[in-house]
From Swiss-Prot:
Transmembrane stretches, start-end: none
Listed PANTHER family: ALANINE RACEMASE, ALANINE RACEMASE, CATABOLIC-RELATED
Species assigned in the record: Methylobacterium sp. (strain 4-46)
InterPro entries according to UniProt: Ala_racemase (IPR000821), Ala_racemase/Decarboxylase_C (IPR009006), Ala_racemase_C (IPR011079), Ala_racemase_N (IPR001608), PLP-binding_barrel (IPR029066)
Pfam families named in the record: Ala_racemase_C, Ala_racemase_N
Name of the protein in question: Alanine racemase
């Protein structure tokens, strides 16, 4: 902790591991370009630091969700190709053009607005086309996309990329994935001049049929397992530590936390951490989460509150479980996937919620 911020958690982000993960995914992609998804502040790791680290590793194409994220990405990555996945909000075309950003167009209305802007400017500006193959969120249907191929609707647009998004690529042998792969291949064949991109983190490991010319990993870059149920080929990127504020011994029958939802089964030693759900640590992990103190797994007891977490450190060495020491909530064998599972959610949500008040440290 710094002298001005002695409370709270410390989020350590290993940019060397981030770069190594990109290189591992690029190797797996076997000839396809490996882009990087850096939306949601690079999954909570900091777009201003993660983006340049990925650029230095060799990444040249980046994806974000919002225009505001793209503006931050452009400031950090002046030479990169940057696509905005959530498309073209009405009236936003000038901002895209002024910052050399590329919208991912997913409806006839967006295509018409972008084309009209290009005509008015006398420029054919680049954009991606989004075809929906099963997610039913954003994108043209396969039939709508096929109707555009070779037609006048795209004459004024420098369409550069065709994308879709896999629903459940992490599920081996998934029938929905097989159908998406086939539908996307059918549409991609009608746009031979466009780079095609289907594979996400898990899709990168599905072989050439799901990769096409570009893969777009996100979660795996930041240490998430792209193949749940199997060994994680990615290196951990994020570590979360919190300071122990106080240690106390409690007798059998003592309760801890709001609503007295935990009762000591015997004499226990409890440590209170300077961390809570206001820091993005999930309240849903109450009674299920764990932390590591001096190599020992210690259960979270009682209800996780806004600013504090209670650990049962009875089995941890007393010299380690003391005021001012640190407990590790992500790291030391506790990966983001496990933390998510213990909170009844996914590691993506854990990553993107962290760091609201945490001190950040980067390993370059």
């Amino acid at each position: 902790m710094t002298a001005t911020s002695p409370h709270g958690a410390r989020l350590t982000i290993n940019l060397r591991a981030l770069a190594a993960n990109w290189r591992r995914l690029a190797e797996e992609a076997a000839g396809a370009e490996c882009a990087a998804v850096i939306k949601a502040d690079a999954y909570g790791t900091g777009i201003d630091r993660a983006g340049p680290a990925l650029w230095r590793a060799g990444c040249r194409t980046f994806f974000v969700a919002h225009l505001s994220e793209a503006e931050r990405a452009r400031a950090a990555l002046p030479e990169a190709v940057i696509y905005v996945l959530n498309g073209l909000p009405p009236g936003s075309a000038p901002a895209y053009r002024d910052r050399a950003l590329r919208p991912v167009l997913g409806s006839r209305e967006e295509i018409e607005e972008w084309a009209a802007f290009c005509r008015a400017r006398g420029e054919r500006l680049p954009a991606a086309l989004h075809v929906d193959t099963g997610m039913n969120r954003l994108g043209l249907s396969p039939d709508e996309a096929l109707a555009l191929a070779g037609g006048a609707a795209l004459e004024d647009v420098a369409a550069s990329l065709l994308v879709s998004h896999l629903v459940s690529a992490e599920v081996p042998g998934d029938a929905v994935t097989a159908r998406q792969v086939a539908d996307f291949a059918r549409v991609a064949a009608a746009f031979p001049g466009l780079t095609a991109s289907l594979g996400n983190s898990a899709g990168t490991f599905l072989g050439a049929r799901a990769r096409h010319e570009m893969v777009r990993p996100g979660y795996a870059l930041y240490g998430g397992n792209p193949r749940p149920g199997g060994p994680n080929p990615m290196r951990p990127v994020v570590r979360l530590d919190a300071t122990i504020l106080q240690v106390r011994d409690v007798p059998p029958g003592a309760t801890a936390g709001y609503n007295a939802r935990w009762t000591a089964p015997g004499p226990r030693r409890l440590a209170t951490l300077s961390l809570g759900y206001a820091d993005g640590y999930p309240r849903a992990g109450s009674g299920r989460a764990e932390a590591v103190v001096a190599g020992r797994r210690c259960p979270v007891v009682g209800t996780i509150s806004m600013d504090l977490v209670i650990l049962d450190v009875t089995d941890a060495p007393p010299e380690a479980a003391r005021r001012g020491a640190r407990a590790t909530l992500i790291g030391e064998g506790l990966d983001i996937d496990e933390v998510g599972q213990r909170a009844g959610t996914i590691g993506y949500e854990i990553l993107t919620n962290l760091g609201r008040r945490s001190e950040r440290a980067y390993i370059d």
